[in-house]
Swiss-Prot record:
Keywords: Fatty acid biosynthesis, Fatty acid metabolism, Lipid biosynthesis, Lipid metabolism, Lyase. The homology between the prokaryotic Shewanella and eukaryotic Labyrinthulomycetes genes suggests that the polyunsaturated fatty acid synthase subunits have undergone lateral gene transfer. GO terms for biological process: fatty acid biosynthetic process. The gene is ORF-C. NCBIfam families: pfaD_fam. Multidomain protein; including 2 dehydratase (DH) domains that reduce hydroxyl groups to enoyl groups and an enoylreductase (ER) domain that reduces enoyl groups to alkyl groups. This is Polyunsaturated fatty acid synthase subunit C. Signal peptide: none annotated. Residues 944-977 are annotated as: Disordered. It is an enzyme of class 4 (lyase). It comes from Thraustochytrium sp. (strain ATCC 26185 / S-3).
Length: 1497
């Protein structure tokens, strides 16, 4: 969930009582809640609470992983005032696609646990001033009554109240009582009553006997009469009475048939038992459907416990105990499983589990489950089962949970269940849950899914993941003969319900060609229309019509729009064949001719489907005829209406969302697909599309579920003849129809009037035109248009308004205002097209009505005449536009209103550009908002007749003939120059791949942009893309798109995930193998190679001067696995193994030249170290390797002809091992050294060692500076540690994200501790630097632990080691003997007290990195975080952008970080071209020119 960012938030102790209790103030935000949970209470409640922080245990909220509170909005309590009625209100924003989610529903445990702030309330009241770390909070009782469920994306609100206290004999609080109400959107969801928690010492907790059955309890159980289960055992799985761990995991994946068999309706079940992380039942050793005292079922489940399971350390910090809510959730999971086992789902069809409304669920906790190896045993007895008033089945159960501690020798015996609950500590019931009640609620009566799932695009098909299965058809050249198909007579009896209605699309022109198939036809409430578009002839992509296989042809798309969906997408979509689900637009709006390919799909298990709907790229094509109906209806023959452009851009998204199976993630069959918003950029408005194929590359950028809604996000890019002219981003939603029953619009349901009505503009200022077909308004509006004008829309189909109201010089900006109204007619042509079974007006046509209003304003105000434009016509102005839809118009709507406010009118270079913002209403509800509508008035061809005479006419033979007779397209010229401001200049500079021609008026200083070089008078800003930076051979050698690699951060901080993420975007990443044991390096290499079989990737080889076996083991692994790129770092001298790796990859090409397979990047910080990598391998090392048989004579001979490394990465002031040298000093020295040695060694040009730069590269300026100094590539390091893929913990990421360049210092290094070598680390938020330096000081001062003063040794043990020296030494011995297999080192240390001291100190130094990477909560102050000064520049660079964790709520992606740094460097290079040109006088240091990462790349 995104963090709520507060600027200058006031701490609670500075708030007034009114601010604390008003409910309108954010009393505590998420950051403060996290601090309370994991950090210091004094920082949250105020200085008076600071003394509590000295206690190792105190009342806390759970840590981040189970912290289920987002904010506190009310605190009505006072410190040290234990009063009844104290109150607190909290909120929790349920995350979408959260890791605890049950397929959209909020699980039982989260609903209950999100009311956890009774902990914070009693803490605020001061309980720890009494407990003083000796007593800890434990929940005892609670009764929960549910009235519904919550869904992802909703906000839970908890009103928590204190109802009483109990005191000990010494007057201290022993227990407190509380209750809460939980609401969602004002609706009561949960009542929690009888809440009770106590405060206990360790001794009191240990003495607890658990839940003890009284004699009355036992007597009552003995009197219970058994009931008959048979009426409810609909189809019990009697063959399956135990479940294994694997089978329980399978139920999490919704695969019930694999566990219980294909009978009893199991294949049709589409229900996820729980989130994988939330699975609290690992196995079920017993299912007895006639067992238990009630005879309705006895089920026994088991949860395996390990000390390191996730739920212990997060609940709570330094007081680990399993949360009762999680334990109780296991009861819910068992009951769900049993109800399905009985076959009750056969009575409902598709279902959801819901709590039984109004039924109390009582929980008693009488023992703590602290970390241990063992298991929980759940003993569930069904006490009631039946059907409610809606005939939904329900079940109620009692559950006892028994804690079995293997470490205490405890066991569980099924045969002795009766002994539990009798007070025996070895048979202790820790939780007693009475009355858990669930029902199976019917989802719908829609058609169920087929029992056999067939993938849309099976993995084995050659078409998946590649476009190479068939070459995409090239965009055709303009041809006057490429026209729309001739109409074919439609048959009669075409409406749904007519027994004579055809079942095939016999009127499709393509079906009339011999050998072609005929698409099927499914009648609807509307009569079909003629086929408006057919593919251009001769395209080989249009021949194979196999459903679900790329490409999808005209036949597949015809099926998708009005036939059988499964005949387009494959049999998995059969359930949609007869549903009312949205389809691809039909007839006149069918603007996807074919889907050429889909790539980048990720075939994984995702909810109930077999691919990740967030991953995929599709190429769609539209063959645009020269005389399409929309051209005939436009103002001139070559003008494509903006609505059609929008549809072409967006419709491929509608195909891709289905190919990615998003509809299959929805529970219902009748689901609706709606565009929500978009940002688009018309980058080239001079392209003629007639007779050409428009290609659309649409990429999915994300998919998420929000309750019953799925949201899909895409980017798109349109091109013709490889010229990109339109691009943008958009999002769509999949909805159930009920969502639109009461649409809220843009104003939260409030209806409003158009602006001129609300502002009561005098009627005399409003000029109205009736523009219905045949009405006089069409003629009068255009009566005064200049001679030869083509400004009017020429057909009724191109008109979207009945009446237009214009107010000159009015609107919000005083530049012009237009209002239009249309009476919605259920027979409007577009309802049949969009969509065939789901009629709704396309949003694009609503936007088009706004364009029509802007055109009317331009005509009314005679903008063409005022600016002397001859033969004016309508065309497009390049630029950006955005739209947002929050409602719809359907055939049931009555009236559509739209309005526009002109925001600018600019005349330049022979054209006039009009820009406006607009809104649209559906029956008084404002539902659309559009910004930056752009219309251009430009000179065109003289009109063949007056504009008035063509009003309402159809496209005549004259128009068609004029289209055919043109020999070439006639784009409207934009003029030789265009005046631009600084904002526009920056926008143009950011178009990195386009040259920019500029001039400047010497008098006014006005900048002008030209379309060409303007006879040499313009400054030329050359394109600069990523490939134009650095040395291109670096990119060619490693197969990457950028002159950059992400450097290896040791101990897996540069993780496999980080390397894979970079590699998938063709960026080289180096895995941080240094300091890791061999088995982890092997696992990482296997993972990387599986994900990147063709690369690119590198693995770090770090010099190990004290363990040559480790270096050899790594090289053995690299050669075994075929690792072809190694980053060699920290080498103070060349070693046999690094030379062996290089030589082992050498062979001869056919021409005798050396073929290099194994590449080395040498990471150095000194000239003498660079020299050893630039020269050939030393002779003595080659001879040694030959003698040992590790290389051949041939390989040695070849090694004498090549440098040891292909690349040198010059490491300047950086994190970890560093010489702190500035890059502007060391980089030129090493480049000069390389040049000299290259000549001296006589290498050919192909063997020139490239020199790159690393250290301090945290922003575009640093990258640009290094590259301008001659770096062939750059290396990033510290900045990648902040990224979500790095192998460290969120505590470290958080600390790094708040660091500045000065928050670093030097501290002793573990690997070369004795030599006094230091490394650069983060000092903010950790005591590691001072403690590590203290250890080195002691090492230098004393020869042994025995010679240290006792107080010094005690300080080391208590403050630094935090354990006894004997324990440290034992762990050190275990590590060297069992992990490093180096007992000799320990034997030496036993004889050498100084070495023993060194090894123990290195124990701390080494573990400090592990604690940081693993996020060990109780060693936060000892975190060792390698960090360079680049972190300060990086944090400043991303502040306030989408990469900023405080803005996005998540840590950035390594790909985005590195691409943005490089893109910024490209931009700066172009900006510097202006700075250095004497013809341009521009203040480039202006804040307007600062590069900021504004969107995902």
């Amino acid at each position: 969930m995104a963090l709520r960012v507060k600027t200058n938030k006031k701490p609670c102790w500075e708030m007034t009582k009114e601010e604390l209790t008003s409910g309108k103030t954010e009393v505590f935000n998420y950051e403060e809640l996290l601090e309370f949970a994991e950090g210091d209470i004094g920082k949250v409640f105020g200085p008076e609470f600071a003394p509590i922080d000295k206690y190792s245990r105190r009342v806390r909220l759970p840590a981040r992983e189970y912290l289920l509170v987002t904010r506190v909005t009310l605190m009505d309590a006072e410190p040290n005032n234990y009063r009844v009625g104290a109150r607190m209100v909290t909120e929790y924003d349920l995350p979408v696609n959260g890791e605890l989610s049950e397929g959209g529903d909020c699980p039982w445990a989260v609903l209950v646990e999100s009311g956890q702030c009774d902990l914070m309330l009693i803490s605020y009241m001061g309980i720890d001033f009494q407990c003083q770390g000796d007593r800890v909070y434990r929940l005892l009782n609670t009764t929960l009554t549910f009235y519904g469920v919550a869904h992802e994306g909703e906000t839970l609100e908890y009103d928590i109240r204190v109802t009483g206290f109990a005191k000990r004999l010494d007057g201290g609080i022993s227990m407190f009582f509380f209750e809460y109400d939980c609401y969602v959107n004002g609706r009561l969801l949960i009542e929690m009553r009888d809440g009770c928690a106590g405060f206990f010492t360790n001794e009191e907790l240990a003495a607890g006997k658990g839940v003890v059955f009284t004699r009355a309890d036992l007597a009552a159980r003995a009197k219970v009469a058994k009931q008959d289960i048979s009426p409810y055992a609909v189809a019990p799985c009697l063959h399956k009475t135990t479940l294994s761990e694997k089978e329980m995991q399978t139920l999490v994946d919704k695969d019930w048939a694999s566990v219980f068999g294909s009978k009893n309706g199991m294949p049709e079940i589409n229900y996820k038992l729980c989130a994988r992380k939330m699975l609290m039942i690992d196995r079920v050793p017993k299912i007895d459907h006639t067992g238990g005292i009630y005879g309705l079922g006895l089920i026994v489940g088991e949860k395996i416990l390990e000390r390191d399971h996730w739920y212990f350390p997060c609940h709570f910090v330094k007081d680990e105990v399993m949360a009762g809510s999680l334990v109780s959730d296991g009861c819910s999971q068992m009951l769900k499983m049993y109800m399905i086992w009985l076959g009750l789902h056969l009575t409902t069809g598709p279902f959801d589990f819901r709590p039984v409304s109004g039924h109390p669920n009582k929980v008693r906790c009488r023992g703590q489950i602290s970390p241990h190896k063992g298991k929980l045993v759940y003993v569930m007895e069904i006490k009631e089962i039946g059907f409610d008033e809606k005939n939904d089945p329900y079940a109620i159960a009692d559950v006892n949970i028994i804690d079995i501690d293997y470490e205490k020798g405890q066991t569980f015996e099924m045969s002795r269940l009766g002994d539990y609950g009798k007070g025996d500590l070895n048979k202790k019931i820790v939780v007693d849950f009475k009355g858990i009640a669930l029902k199976m609620q019917k989802r719908s009566t829609s058609t169920e899914e087929p029992s056999k799932v067939v993938p849309v695009f099976a993995k084995g098909q050659a078409t998946v993941g590649t476009e190479a299965s068939r070459a995409p058809g090239a965009a055709t050249a303009y041809s006057p003969d490429v026209l729309a198909p001739a109409p074919v007579a439609l048959p009669k009896n075409l409406l749904k319900g007519d027994p004579l209605a055809p079942r095939e699309m016999t009127w499709h022109p393509m079906a009339r060609i011999p050998g072609n198939p005929t698409p099927s036809f499914a009648p609807s409430a509307y009569a079909p229309r003629n086929i408006a578009f057919t593919p251009f002839p001769g395209n080989p992509l249009d021949n194979d019509h196999t459903p679900g296989k790329m490409p999808l042809t005209w036949f597949n798309m015809a099926e998708f729009m009005a036939g059988k969906v499964s005949q387009c997408l494959g049999p998995e979509f059969t359930k949609f064949d007869n549903s009312n689900t949205s389809r691809s637009p039909a007839w006149d709006l069918a603007l996807v001719t074919r889907a050429v390919s889909v790539t980048d799909m990720e075939h994984v298990k995702w909810r109930n489907i077999d691919c990740n709907p967030s991953k995929g790229t599709m190429i769609g094509e539209f063959d645009c005829p020269a005389d399409a109906w929309f051209y005939k209806g436009a103002a001139n023959d070559g003008h494509m209406p903006y609505s059609i452009l929008m549809e072409i851009a967006l419709q491929t998204s509608g195909v891709l969302t289905s190919v990615l199976k998003a509809p299959l993630t929805m529970e219902k069959d009748d689901i609706l697909f709606r565009n929500l918003d978009a940002n688009a950029d018309f980058v080239r408005a001079d392209v003629d599309f007639r007779g050409k194929t428009i290609r659309n590359i649409t990429k999915c950028t994300g998919y998420s579920m929000l309750g019953e809604m799925g949201v899909h996000r895409f980017s798109f890019e349109l091109s013709v003849d490889d010229v990109v002219f339109y691009k943008g981003t958009t999002s769509f939603g999949w909805f159930v129809p009920e969502v639109f029953a009461a649409q809220a619009g843009l104003d939260s349901g409030r209806k409003s009037e158009p602006w001129f009505v609300e502002q009561k503009v005098p009627a005399g200022q409003v000029v109205s035109y009736d523009v219905r077909p045949g009405a006089s308004g069409r003629t009068s509006l255009f009566a005064n248009a200049p001679s030869g004008a083509q400004l009017n829309r020429r057909t009724n189909q191109g008109q979207y308004l009945d009446k237009i109201d214009l107010v000159s010089g009015s609107g919000k900006q005083g530049l012009g205002y237009g209002h239009g109204v249309k009476a919605v007619n259920p027979n409007d042509w577009f309802f049949a097209c969009h969509f065939w079974f789901d009629s709704v007006m396309p949003g694009s046509l609503g936007v088009e009505s706004m364009f029509q209003l802007v055109e009317a304003i331009a005509v009314q105000d005679d903008l063409a005449g005022k600016h002397g434009i001859a033969n004016p016509t309508i065309t497009h102005a390049p630029g950006k536009i955005s739209w947002k839809y929050r409602g719809q118009l359907t055939p049931k709507s009555k009236q559509m209103d739209s309005e526009v406010h002109v925001t600018s009118i600019e005349a330049h270079d022979g054209v006039v550009d009009v820009v406006a913002d607009g809104y649209l209403w559906a029956d008084g509800l404002r539902v659309y908002q559009v910004n930056n509508i752009r219309v251009r008035i430009a000179s065109g061809e003289p009109a063949a007749s007056s504009s008035a005479s063509s009003v309402g006419s159809s496209a005549s033979a004259e128009v068609a003939e004029r289209t055919r007779s043109k020999a070439a397209p006639q784009p409207v010229a934009s003029g030789p120059a265009q005046s631009i401001n600084l904002e526009q200049l920056k926008t143009d500079l950011l178009e990195l791949d386009a040259p920019l021609y500029l001039s400047q008026d010497p008098t006014t200083g006005q900048l002008k942009k030209h379309t060409d070089v303007a006879s040499g008078q313009a400054t030329i800003v050359q394109p600069c893309t990523l490939g134009d930076l650095g040395d291109r051979s670096f990119m060619e050698t490693y197969g990457v798109v950028a002159p950059l690699y992400t450097g290896a951060m040791a101990k897996g901080i540069a993780s496999a995930d980080l390397v894979i993420a970079a590699g998938k975007r063709k960026i080289l990443g180096s895995f941080g193998a240094g300091g890791l044991p061999m088995h982890l390096v092997r696992e990482a290499v296997d993972k990387i190679q599986a994900a990147l079989p063709q690369g690119p990737y590198a693995v770090n080889l770090i010099h190990s001067p004290f363990d040559s076996n480790l270096e050899k083991g790594n090289v053995d692994l690299f050669l075994e696995k075929g690792v072809t790129v190694v980053e060699a770092s920290a080498f103070m001298t060349l070693t046999p193994q690094v030379v062996r790796y290089r030589a082992a990859g050498l062979s001869r090409n056919a021409d005798g030249s050396v073929r290099i397979r194994n590449r080395i990047i040498g990471k150095v910080s000194r000239t003498e170290l660079a020299e050893m990598f630039i020269r050939p391998a030393p002779e003595h090392l080659l001879e040694k390797l030959i003698a040992s048989g590790e290389i051949t004579q041939e390989q040695a001979e070849l090694a004498r002809r090549v440098p040891v490394a292909d690349d040198i990465a010059v490491e300047a002031d950086s994190g970890g091992h560093t010489d702190n040298r500035p890059i502007h000093v060391i980089l030129p020295l090493i480049i000069n050294l390389r040049n000299r040695l290259h000549r001296e060694c006589g290498y050919p040009a192909s063997l020139r060692v490239r020199v790159g730069a690393g250290g301090g590269v945290g922003c575009p300026q640093a990258a640009a500076a290094a590259l301008s100094m001659g770096a062939a590539f750059i290396v990033t390091g510290t900045v990648n540690q902040v990224c979500k893929q790095s192998g460290t913990c969120d505590n470290v990421r958080k600390a790094l994200s708040k660091a500045s360049y000065s928050d670093i210092c030097m501290a002793p290094a573990a690997d070369m501790f004795e030599e006094g070598v230091k490394l650069q680390v983060l000092k903010k938020g950790t005591m590691f630097p001072s403690r590590a330096n203290k250890l080195y000081e002691l090492f230098c001062k004393y020869d042994s632990f025995e010679s240290m003063p006792p107080n010094e040794l005690e300080r080391v043990e208590k403050r630094i080691f935090q354990r006894a020296l004997a324990e440290v030494w034992q762990e050190t011995k275990d590590f060297y003997i069992n992990r490093l297999h180096n007992p000799e080192k320990i034997q030496r240390a036993e004889r050498d007290p100084k070495l023993k001291m060194s090894l123990c100190f290195r124990w701390y130094l080494g573990l400090a990195s592990f604690w940081a990477n693993a996020g060990i909560a109780d060693r936060v102050m000892d975190y060792q975080v390698w960090c360079g000064p680049a972190i300060g520049a990086f944090n400043d660079f991303i502040k306030g952008t989408y990469l900023d964790p405080e803005v996005s709520g998540e840590y950035p992606c390594v790909v985005q970080v590195n691409l943005q740094i490089l893109r910024g460097a490209c931009y700066l290079r172009r900006l510097n071209a202006l700075r250095n040109d004497p013809r341009i006088d521009l203040e480039t240091e202006d804040a307007a020119f600062v590069y900021e990462p504004t969107g995902s790349l």
